[in-house]
């Protein structure tokens, strides 16, 4: 639903803003929530209508955000700053919509693509720092806002169900891709099993570690704040590290048709790992360090099988621009995993070198 400007001014009046509102305009290119920039004769703000189709439990979502941001602020970290409603709540239900306001973080930039290893190293530092400052936080306090989000065995069961149904008869056109995921079935439970038996610690995980969720200082280029905290959940930090490697250490876009352009860059892997481990070295466990290289494989396989399951089901989840779009995405993910497997000894050596240097 598109709100009128008059409606938006009325919605903004429910929040304890400093200064008179002078303008409200659409902001950013996010696809989940609807976001506006609020200008006043004082500070600027971000006004958001939350997507309750994807996140139906607004109460616990905002509770998660409040718990994590208050913990970070107590340690002097810059983070999202929730602006309360005029009645002191963290969000408001207005005309059937769920709304919230954050203070706008000024003098920052963000990137959609990795421009160079230095920026990716800084991204690693930002998410390592995020993990480090929350290392003593009891992640079991958090609610799972999207069930089974990085539960790879559960995703594999979803994939097998889509394959068994094959409701559009597409399986015959992608048998090599199907065989790839079936042949790796013994790898999918490694992290979930570790979380269950305690060999991998339960931590706060961000679960959407795209580069554009880091605000960097416009002058120094240093990371200032991690944003988009809606998918904050309990899990393994290997989820965040692995997904960062999946998208950031690739030389091509996720839907590149020409697989000769798709490569796994160990240079970018090293850069991110240097930043991440450099911040987290005080709390990373030996088992987590051992699994850092594999986490890239795991999260890339998980994402690829989700693309393939969606292709088999008729493209009902991921937005597509042409009939084979999800299959193309699947193939890029498989190519990345194949190169990760080929370079496994190199990435293990990189992690060992960085861990040794960080001692």
Curated annotation (Swiss-Prot):
Keywords attached to this Swiss-Prot or TrEMBL record, sorted alphabetically, are: ATP-binding, Carbohydrate metabolism, Kinase, Magnesium, Nucleotide-binding, Transferase
Q: Which InterPro entries match?
A: Aminoglycoside_PTrfase (IPR002575), Kinase-like_dom_sf (IPR011009), Pseudomonas-type_ThrB (IPR050249)
User: What is this enzyme's class at the first EC digit?
Assistant: transferase
Q: How does activity depend on temperature?
A: Optimum temperature is 40 degrees Celsius.
State a single Gene Ontology molecular function. phosphotransferase activity, alcohol group as acceptor
> One Pfam match, by short name?
APH
Gene3D superfamilies on file: 3.90.1200.10, Phosphorylase Kinase, domain 1 (3.30.200.20)
Q: What EC identifiers does the entry list?
A: 2.7.1.162
Q: Which GO terms describe its biological process?
A: carbohydrate metabolic process
The source's domain of life comes to Bacteria
Keyword match Kinase? yes
pH profile of the protein: Optimum pH is 8.5. Stable at pH 5.0 to 9.5 at 30 degrees Celsius.
* Reaction(s) catalysed by this chain's protein: N-acetyl-D-hexosamine + ATP = N-acetyl-alpha-D-hexosamine 1-phosphate + ADP + H(+)
User: Which cofactors go with this protein?
Assistant: Mg(2+)
Which residues does the UniProt record annotate as the domain Protein kinase? Answer: 21-359
Known function: Phosphorylates both N-acetylglucosamine (GlcNAc) and N-acetylgalactosamine (GalNAc) at similar rates. Involved in the lacto-N-biose I/galacto-N-biose (LNB/GNB) degradation pathway, which is important for host intestinal colonization by bifidobacteria. Also accepts GTP and ITP as phosphate donors. In vitro, can phosphorylate several GlcNAc and GalNAc derivatives.
Name the family. Belongs to the protein kinase superfamily.
The identity of this protein, by name, is N-acetylhexosamine 1-kinase
Source organism (scientific name): Bifidobacterium longum subsp. longum (strain ATCC 15707 / DSM 20219 / JCM 1217 / NCTC 11818 / E194b)
Q: Which gene encodes it?
A: nahK
